[in-house]
Amino acid sequence: MTISGPGLIYGRGLTREESRLPGVGNKAISLKLCKNITLKDFSMLRCGHFALLATGVDNLSIINLKVDTNRDGFDIDCCKNVRIMGCSVNSPWDDAIVLKASYALGSFRDTENVTISDCYVTGYDRGTMLDATWQRDEPQAPDHGYVTGRIKLGTESSGGFKNIVITNCIFERCRGLALETVDG
């Protein structure tokens, strides 16, 4: 399956709290147990708690996406053979790109063979990367007092990570690269 632009997915800034309302979701794109997925050449704005949640996906390519969101950009969980290339992700209130190896599939599964290259990760105000104003006026996330917007490995992880490559990425106004044992 391929989703290719140009175009904009506008999630209207839904939060995890609002997702409890009938008919309301908190993910712009959610993929589970899929193979051979390509996402390329489009933009995503204010996409809720997850712009992209990929769980148990094999052979996933994310190419040249521009994501400007209020919470997580890309959550890659229990996935194999993933390429994230040439993406710009602004996520001041949460992680830009996070790799997990959780128990979401009902069994342990490593996240492996992941390459993140030529990406730009920032924590500017929501919506200001896509409109190129790069503002810094917004109050911080409601659940912590700092800008996040980083690449992270470790949240909710009880499985392992194998063959992870992060190369030629730029981190600006964010918390950089995090290797953490959190929630797992």
Describe the predicted segments one by one.
Residues 1-184:
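Extracellular/periplasmic carbohydrate-active domains that bind, remodel
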